[in-house]
């Protein structure tokens, strides 16, 4: 039906609705109900059984597994609509209570639908417990597991090259990532910035 901030899809089940994070308008999904509070159900997305007709955007090979982006499967115009509706609902809930009239002017889109990030913070970790070194983004819904996003669509080729080179180097010299539970290891984050005008990294 719609997506509320932050990424909370409102899913119809017969005459009822449930909040299922990371679901998109038009998708058919399987989910498990985690809790029901004040008559409102909240669920965890298990599987997208049928993609939305809106999902015609270009995605990377890890889309859905990686938690780095949610709306990339939608064309950029649809992404903007979803985000604009979210912002307007948030503002409505506050500004409609005041006496003065206000006008929502919309949001301004980026000139680039892909490779638009000029700063990224990648995390070191492993893709599964005791797995090989990974450098990239957190898996969707996970605080610990990391996926190496070698073909990420929201950064350009320079970022992808740096990501792969740094990961390969530290894997080769066997420097471990920092383990939150045991407080062992060293590597935590890789922050990369690129000046859009000069290309300086």
List where the protein language model places each region.
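Accessory RNA-recognition modules of RNA-modification enzymes
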Residues: 1-201
